[in-house]
Protein backbone atom coordinates (compact mmCIF):
# COMPACT_ATOMS: atom_id res chain seq x y z
CA UNK A 1 0.00 0.00 0.00
CA UNK A 2 2.76 2.46 0.92
CA UNK A 3 4.59 1.76 -2.33
CA UNK A 4 1.47 2.66 -4.34
CA UNK A 5 1.11 5.95 -2.48
CA UNK A 6 4.79 6.67 -3.00
CA UNK A 7 4.49 5.88 -6.73
CA UNK A 8 1.51 8.23 -7.12
CA UNK A 9 3.24 11.04 -5.23
CA UNK A 10 6.42 10.53 -7.24
CA UNK A 11 4.46 10.65 -10.50
CA UNK A 12 2.68 13.86 -9.45
CA UNK A 13 5.97 15.51 -8.46
CA UNK A 14 7.58 14.44 -11.73
CA UNK A 15 4.70 15.78 -13.82
CA UNK A 16 4.69 19.11 -12.01
CA UNK A 17 8.40 19.52 -12.77
CA UNK A 18 7.97 18.58 -16.42
CA UNK A 19 4.90 20.74 -16.97
CA UNK A 20 6.32 23.83 -15.27
CA UNK A 21 8.77 24.86 -17.99
CA UNK A 22 9.44 28.58 -18.15
CA UNK A 23 9.99 30.72 -21.24
CA UNK A 24 10.64 34.31 -22.21
CA UNK A 25 7.34 35.98 -23.08
CA UNK A 26 6.57 36.41 -26.77
CA UNK A 27 7.11 39.99 -27.93
CA UNK A 28 4.08 41.83 -29.27
CA UNK A 29 6.42 43.98 -31.39
CA UNK A 30 7.39 42.54 -34.78
CA UNK A 31 9.76 45.26 -36.03
CA UNK A 32 11.74 48.18 -34.65
CA UNK A 33 13.57 51.11 -36.23
CA UNK A 34 17.33 50.69 -35.98
CA UNK A 35 17.74 53.96 -34.05
CA UNK A 36 15.36 52.65 -31.34
CA UNK A 37 17.15 49.35 -30.67
CA UNK A 38 18.73 49.18 -27.22
CA UNK A 39 19.82 46.47 -24.82
CA UNK A 40 18.95 46.75 -21.15
CA UNK A 41 20.71 43.42 -20.57
CA UNK A 42 22.98 40.91 -22.27
CA UNK A 43 22.59 37.94 -19.92
CA UNK A 44 20.30 36.83 -17.10
CA UNK A 45 22.81 38.08 -14.50
CA UNK A 46 22.11 41.65 -15.69
CA UNK A 47 18.48 41.30 -14.55
CA UNK A 48 17.08 41.38 -11.02
CA UNK A 49 14.19 39.84 -9.13
CA UNK A 50 14.10 36.54 -10.99
CA UNK A 51 13.62 38.09 -14.42
CA UNK A 52 15.40 36.84 -17.53
CA UNK A 53 17.19 38.65 -20.33
CA UNK A 54 14.89 38.19 -23.33
CA UNK A 55 15.47 39.18 -26.95
CA UNK A 56 12.92 41.34 -28.79
CA UNK A 57 13.07 43.13 -32.14
CA UNK A 58 13.85 46.34 -30.21
CA UNK A 59 16.70 44.85 -28.17
CA UNK A 60 17.19 42.79 -25.02
CA UNK A 61 15.02 43.50 -22.00
CA UNK A 62 14.53 41.95 -18.57
CA UNK A 63 11.21 40.09 -18.51
CA UNK A 64 9.59 37.73 -16.06
CA UNK A 65 9.33 34.18 -17.40
CA UNK A 66 5.99 32.74 -18.42
CA UNK A 67 4.69 29.22 -18.94
CA UNK A 68 3.81 29.91 -22.60
CA UNK A 69 6.51 29.35 -25.23
CA UNK A 70 7.13 31.81 -28.04
CA UNK A 71 9.73 34.25 -26.74
CA UNK A 72 13.48 34.06 -27.12
CA UNK A 73 16.22 34.36 -24.53
CA UNK A 74 19.03 36.79 -25.32
CA UNK A 75 22.14 35.08 -26.66
CA UNK A 76 24.54 37.49 -24.94
CA UNK A 77 28.16 36.96 -25.87
CA UNK A 78 31.16 39.27 -26.08
CA UNK A 79 29.64 41.43 -28.83
CA UNK A 80 26.56 42.29 -26.75
CA UNK A 81 26.65 45.77 -25.19
CA UNK A 82 24.02 47.49 -23.07
CA UNK A 83 22.54 50.78 -24.21
CA UNK A 84 21.59 51.88 -27.70
CA UNK A 85 23.17 49.68 -30.36
CA UNK A 86 22.76 52.17 -33.23
UniProtKB/Swiss-Prot annotation:
Gene Ontology BP annotations: defense response to bacterium
GO cellular component: extracellular region
Matches recorded under InterPro entries: Elafin-like_sf
PTM info: Contains 5 disulfide bonds.
Compartment(s) of residence: Secreted
The organism of origin for this protein: Lycosa singoriensis (Wolf spider)
Endpoints of the signal sequence: 1-20
UniProt entry keywords in alphabetical sequence: Antibiotic, Antimicrobial, Disulfide bond, Secreted, Signal, Toxin
Annotated ranges, domain WAP: 21-66
Protein name: U15-lycotoxin-Ls1d
Family affiliation: Belongs to the venom protein 11 family. 01 (wap-1) subfamily.
SUPFAM superfamilies linked to this entry: Elafin-like (SSF57256)
Amino acid sequence: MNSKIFAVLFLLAFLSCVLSDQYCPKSSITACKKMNIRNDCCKDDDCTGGSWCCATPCGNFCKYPTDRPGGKRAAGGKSCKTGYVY
